[in-house]
């Protein structure tokens, strides 16, 4: 006897699972979300890990200011408040040069960039936005297409050139478009912190998109509020979330997914669909079982590649001071939401990747950092500050080729990261650190078990795992070879980051398959260029 019967069951209560759940519940379906952890939200984790009153975003930190649920769910009514400062991103070079991206001010950004970047490259970047990106925005919030079918909003030579760039590696498209090493480094590092190495092939569209502003924000009171607001909308529409419910088995009968069984023996029936927000190996090899798969699908899951170059090591600190960069950089840099430093050239970035690929933490540290309290003082008690610095490294089991663990090196690495940051903001002394906390790749994969190896995107971005190949061709459109089973997590197009794309796209596909009329309107990104001449 089943413990409950629902129209749809979603495995995994991360933000993509909750996004799909909200759309389906508002559609009028009876929906159950099952989450292994005692807290839903997946990577949207905010905790007091240093001192009481200091709130730290342990995994997901930034959120895109656009995305369908913002308007469709009216998330502001459920407690979600996005915070944006005057400077969205500040990229600091060791020689004192800086690139400042001003929030929703592309003209000001253009004039600041032209002090560092040749005008021809800036004009090219703006042209990429208007010539290509404004006409292909719908590709992001839609099932992926093969290159030959992409760019339907473009004509003639523009479409051919766009398709040509889509098939390039990140580095190839940067070299194709731009001359300035600094601009190419700026784009490559922005892509890097989203888990996309510039050596990946067939991902050129990803690098083109940096001509458009991601409109980065942080969430007031922490990224956990994203999960709370999504769940509040879901609950308001009759949805049910059960935490502490690890799904052990997706029940397949006659080639169709008809329910799930949890590790503690409970069984839930699904009359219309089951959707998985977790990674392909766990979904298909563990939950579905190889007896229901073709040998080809089983092998694709075994071949699933984790993020070998972008495992995350997080430096979190409760600080007595906010970083002050003004000794070497402008006062404006102190207003930055996301701060990049430590990688000055593409050659340095190549060395970064090489060292990580050989199992080492880079000898010259570099990544992105954030002082949340510059934008939102609620992250810390009055007068205090919350700091975060992300450094990429090898996966948990590849560190020093398995000879060491992150626990072995975390204290030393924390101090190296503080000292590296202090090269740019000298006031970040040991004495000003009230408490520090290491969030290692081991911690990540132990908390979020489908972030295998301690990555941030639920699987590497490679030509074999991007676009129509993500997670693999037979499941790239959110439908899977198992009837009634769908994928909806970051292992699907368009990948990770809090843009809600996989959950939203899966909702569109499922409603179509059910023959229902969507309650929500078509979505169009209201984008802006990073920079503009006028």
Predicted regions and their residues:
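Extreme N-terminal leader/targeting segments of oxidoreductases
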Residues: 1-8, 26-27, 467, 518-534
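N-terminal glycine-rich phosphate/pyrophosphate-binding loop and immediately adjacent elements
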Residues: 2-134
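Helical element adjacent to the flavin cofactor pocket in flavoenzyme catalytic cores
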Residues: 207-266
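Flavin-binding catalytic cores
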Residues: 322-323, 357-362, 406-446
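A conserved FAD-binding loop/helix module that cradles the flavin
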Residues: 490-511
């Amino acid at each position: 006897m089943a413990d409950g019967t629902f129209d749809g069951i979603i495995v995994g209560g991360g933000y993509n699972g909750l996004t799909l759940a909200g759309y389906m519940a508002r559609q009028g379906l009876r929906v159950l979300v099952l989450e292994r952890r005692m807290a839903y939200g997946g990577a949207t984790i905010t905790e007091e890990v240093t001192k009481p009153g200091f709130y730290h975003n342990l995994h997901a930190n930034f959120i895109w200011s656009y995305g369908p649920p913002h308007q469709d769910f009216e998330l502001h009514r459920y407690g979600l408040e996005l915070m944006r400062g005057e400077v969205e991103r500040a990229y600091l070079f060791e020689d004192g040069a800086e690139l400042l991206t001003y929030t929703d001010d592309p003209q000001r950004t253009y004039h600041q960039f032209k002090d560092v970047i040749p005008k021809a490259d800036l004009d090219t970047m703006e042209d990429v936005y208007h010539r290509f990106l404004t006409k292909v925005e719908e590709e992001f919030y839609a099932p992926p297409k093969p290159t030959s079918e992409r760019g339907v909003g473009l004509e003639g030579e523009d479409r051919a050139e766009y398709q040509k760039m889509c098939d390039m590696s990140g580095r190839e498209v940067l070299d194709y478009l731009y001359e300035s090493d600094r601009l190419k480094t700026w784009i490559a590092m922005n892509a890097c912190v989203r888990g996309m190495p510039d050596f990946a092939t067939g991902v050129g569209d990803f690098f083109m998109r940096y001509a458009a502003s991601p409109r980065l924000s942080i969430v007031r009171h922490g990224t956990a509020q994203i999960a709370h607001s999504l769940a509040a909308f879901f609950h308001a529409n009759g949805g049910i979330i059960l935490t502490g419910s690890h799904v052990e088995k997706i029940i397949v009968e006659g080639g169709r997914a008809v329910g799930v069984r949890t590790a503690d023996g409970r069984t839930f029936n699904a009359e219309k669909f089951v959707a998985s927000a977790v990674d392909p190996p766990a979904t298909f090899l563990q939950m579905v079982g190889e007896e229901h798969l073709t040998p080809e699908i089983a092998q694709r899951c075994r071949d699933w590649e984790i993020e070998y170059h972008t495992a995350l090591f997080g430096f979190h600190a409760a600080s007595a001071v906010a970083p002050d960069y003004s000794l070497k950089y402008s006062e404006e840099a102190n207003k930055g939401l996301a701060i990049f430093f430590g990688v000055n050239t593409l050659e340095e970035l190549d060395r970064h990747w090489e060292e990580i690929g050989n199992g080492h933490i880079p000898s010259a540290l570099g990544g992105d950092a954030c002082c949340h309290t510059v934008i939102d003082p609620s992250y810390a008690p009055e007068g205090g500050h919350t700091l975060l610095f992300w450094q990429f490294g090898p996966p948990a089991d590849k560190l020093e080729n398995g000879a060491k663990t992150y626990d072995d090196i975390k204290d030393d690495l924390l101090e190296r990261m503080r000292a590296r940051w202090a090269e740019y903001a000298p006031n970040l002394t040991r004495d000003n650190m009230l408490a520090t906390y290491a969030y290692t790749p081991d911690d990540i994969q132990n908390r979020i078990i489908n972030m295998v190896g301690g990555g941030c995107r639920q699987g590497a971005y490679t030509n074999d795992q991007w676009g129509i190949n993500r997670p693999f061709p037979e499941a790239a459109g959110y439908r899977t070879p198992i009837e009634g089973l769908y994928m909806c997590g970051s292992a699907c197009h368009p990948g990770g980051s809090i843009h809600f794309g996989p959950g939203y796209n899966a909702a569109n596909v499922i409603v179509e398959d059910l023959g229902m009329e969507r309650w929500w309107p078509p979505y169009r990104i209201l984008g802006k260029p990073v920079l503009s001449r006028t």
